Amino acid sequence: MQKTYLLALVSLLASSLVEARSTIADQTRLDVGGSDESFDGIDGIDPNNSNVLTHKLMDKVIASSELLSLHRSLVEIKSISDNEQAVGGFLMDYLSSKNFTVEKQYVDYDDPTGKPIRSNRRFNIYAYPGDSASPGIILTSHIDTVPPFIPYSLSHPESDSFKRDDILISGRGTVDDKASVACQIIAAMEHLEKHPDIPIGLLFVVSEEVGGKGMSTFSDSRLNSGTYHTIIFGEPTERALVAGHKGMVSFGIRVHGKPAHSGYPWLGRSAVSEILPILAEVDRLGDIPVSQGGLPSSEKYGRTTLNIGFMSGGVAANVVPEQAVAKVAVRLAAGDPEDAKDIIFRAIRNAATKHRKDATVVISNGHEQPKGDIEVIFGLEAYGVVDIDADVDGFNVTTVNYGTDVPHWKIYGDNVKRYLYGPGTIFVAHGKDEALTVGELEAGLEGYKTLVAKAAERERT
């Protein structure tokens, strides 16, 4: 009797466990590999903990895909600008294992005056199949990220049911720019498997986020052979082809005052009081017409925008400030950067002398003894608007306001096509919520494959 009772109890518990697992599977189902798969068959975890089950299966989705697992490996490696050697080493090993010939190109650092400092810590990676060192098609992205490092993580929508495409991949570089790096590698591998007669090169550069030293180093080297007819640049474009982006001018303003006790301000000259009207004038240069001393606009790119991104001055509230500094980034919508510099300098000089008639405004490199009360220090990097090809059918076309490595690559030869494309949106790049979905990443791969196929057609003709 007791034995029969125990057997019945065991049977009831087993039935309840199966029912519980079935309920969880029904409530939280995930499309894996194109087919619905419940959580049945996953052993060693608590069947009543749906969060554990969900993360286990999301991890399975990533591990089952060459693209997704490569992307995860890249994002898990910290590669903030100037510290890219670890991710570079990983890529060298990965590409070598896929039968690419891989060349390492060291990239110098620059001191504050722009003088190169030799380094063997960071490097570009140039890869190609076999001995095809001068391919006609090159895919390129950058491997550095902005700070801070944010670890790789997976999450899913708050829903009883979701598909694998909905899995959200978060972390620094998931969008900018390791999504493009992963997609470009897989697109190249799939192309070469089908068309080994049309080689593809892969170029992954450092330092894009801090001035483009990686790309300019490649551009000035023997590796920039000029034999290519198509270059596909990777950046987050929401899978649209970018028809161009704004130009860039950066500058700083340094005002030299005279310190004094705050109780007797007339004995000194406040650098902060002098820089404020200058910045007010600078801030409106994109909003006023060129005829009134403003910066140009265009139908394609809209108006030129300025961002006063940094300002500091003084040492204490009871001291008249001896120095004030500001840094400004300008996104040019039209015109030559040298003309823009002239407009900016005139605006600063006019605002300064309006505030104080005897103010002296000079252009400086920022490292020599100042020859005026107010220094204008233009950055080493400056370029005008960048027009890019967008002639492949099947894509949305847009323009963007951010800078890229496109202008840093010196093009040799005629009729070279340049495309800018990639998964993810710039609106989350550089932020704490940088992320994209599995669906976005995989759709990005398909876009790269289309661009590569179009480039291959050009090579055949």
Curated annotation (Swiss-Prot):
Q: Where in the cell is it found?
A: Secreted
Q: Please give the biological process terms from Gene Ontology that the record holds.
A: proteolysis
CDD domains assigned to the protein according to its UniProt record, in alphabetical order: M20_ArgE_DapE-like_fungal (cd05652)
Amino-acid positions noted as binding Zn(2+) 1 in the UniProt annotation, renumbered to this chain? D176, E209
Give me the residues that bind Zn(2+) 2, please.
D176
**Signal peptide per UniProt:** 1-20
Q: Which residues are glycosylated?
A: N48, N99, N396
Entry keyword Zinc: yes
Q: What is its EC number?
A: 3.4.17.-
Instruction: Return the similarity comment.
Output: Belongs to the peptidase M20A family.
Its recorded name reads Probable carboxypeptidase MGYG_04702
Q: Can you name the source organism?
A: Arthroderma gypseum (strain ATCC MYA-4604 / CBS 118893)
What does the UniProt cofactor note say? Binds 2 Zn(2+) ions per subunit.
